[in-house]
Regions:
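Small-residue-rich transmembrane alpha-helices that serve as helix-helix interface/gating elements
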Residues: 294-307
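Extracellular/periplasmic helix-loop-helix junctions in multi-pass membrane proteins
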Residues: 283-297
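Single conserved hydrophobic/aromatic residue that forms the stacking wall/gate
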Residues: 314-323
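Cytosolic, membrane-interface loops and tails of multi-pass inner-membrane proteins
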Residues: 17-42, 235-266
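Alpha-helical transmembrane segments of integral membrane proteins
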Residues: 251, 259-280, 287
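"…together with the soluble PPM/PP2C metallo-phosphatase catalytic core" -> "…together
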Residues: 1-232
Length: 323
């Protein structure tokens, strides 16, 4: 316990040091017509997630060196992109290379079925970017990530899948970030930036990857279902509208709630957090531990969330028509 208190204090100090550097170097996020915020805010505060894993390694040992190397690579490139925009090709090469490092750490690069590895790499990088796209309002990245990692810590209570200290240290980093970001619109001290959203996505996917490989059950991805439904259905919606997927937009469900329906950032972030917590805890404690039950639970929640998303779109369109 004392160790975790020390880690928490060190992370708070590290965040303040970063704020000083970001302020001096003018690492800021300026609002535009597609933003869900209206004030200039420090960018890149999510670097604390990378720092948190390094601090964890310093205290508990570097048990997953390839994972840490991959995280450092993808977060580092993302941080540079936060400061000076990089070509998509550079970011994708870094993301696929980092994902391959994580896969090497997971021990799956030697699998004979190369097409499964290739598909898994595409899913890993795709999911990383979907999580990144979901970082658009105060509190949503940290709050949702807590809703993923807390149930994961409960599943891993005896360290059955991965070092529990890594999960707890990451949770501490998220709590530190929440202090400065889980605030009403216009009140956040910092934003996560790509370094934060990409970094925490990489961490969560690696942790879930350990559980999936150990259990042989891919339905554990339900821990990311709320983000997955919003992110994927938004992409489908934009394709149907013939929009350029590379351009910024405000069509995610959370953006519709925050911008069109004028629901507060903290309320929307809390809603996403609570929904994912309820789904994950139900999966752990209410769903029978069988493959069939897991798939039925996943399918049911997927359908319910998809219908909810579609209804929200119609609600938003109706509101626009009234205006």
């Amino acid at each position: 316990m004392i160790t975790y208190i020390i880690i928490f204090i060190l992370l708070i100090i590290a965040e303040f040091v970063y704020f000083h550097i970001a302020d001096k170097c003018n690492i800021i996020d300026k609002p535009n017509e597609r933003s869900s915020h209206s004030t200039i805010v420090l960018r890149g505060g999510g670097i604390i997630f990378l720092i948190g894993v390094w601090v964890w390694g310093a205290f508990f040992g570097f048990h997953y060196p390839w994972f840490l190397a991959g995280l450092t690579l993808v977060a580092g490139v993302s941080f540079v992109d936060d400061i000076h925009s990089l070509p998509d090709s550079v970011r994708l090469v870094a993301q696929f290379t980092a994902a391959a490092m994580a896969f090497y750490q997971l021990g799956i690069l030697h699998w004979s079925m190369w097409w499964i590895i290739l598909l898994a790499l595409i899913v890993y990088v795709g999911a990383t970017n979907v999580i990144n796209f979901m970082d658009g309002i105060n509190g949503i990245t940290a709050g949702y990530s807590l809703a993923v990692l807390i149930p994961l810590a409960l599943v891993n209570i005896n360290g059955a899948f991965i070092k529990q200290s890594l999960i707890i240290s990451t949770i501490l980093a998220l709590l530190v970030f929440c202090i400065f970001n889980f605030r009403p619109r216009g009140k956040a001290k910092c934003f996560a930036g790509d370094v934060g959203s990409i970094g925490i996505a990489f961490i969560m996917l690696f942790l879930l990857g350990n559980v999936i490989i150990e259990t042989g059950d891919i339905t554990w991805l339900i821990f990311l279902l709320v983000y997955g439904v919003d992110g994927c259905l938004t992409i489908v919606h934009r394709i149907m509208l013939h929009e350029d997927l590379g351009e910024a937009h405000r069509k995610h469900a959370y953006q519709i709630m925050a911008n069109e329906l004028k629901i507060g950032h903290v309320k929307v972030a809390s809603l996403y957090m609570v929904m994912q917590l309820l789904i994950s805890l139900g999966f752990i404690y209410l769903c029978p531990n069988t493959v069939l039950a897991h798939w039925l639970y996943l399918a049911t929640t997927l359908v319910v969330l998809s219908i909810t998303y579609i209804c929200l779109l119609y609600t938003s369109d109706a509101a626009d028509d009234r205006i």
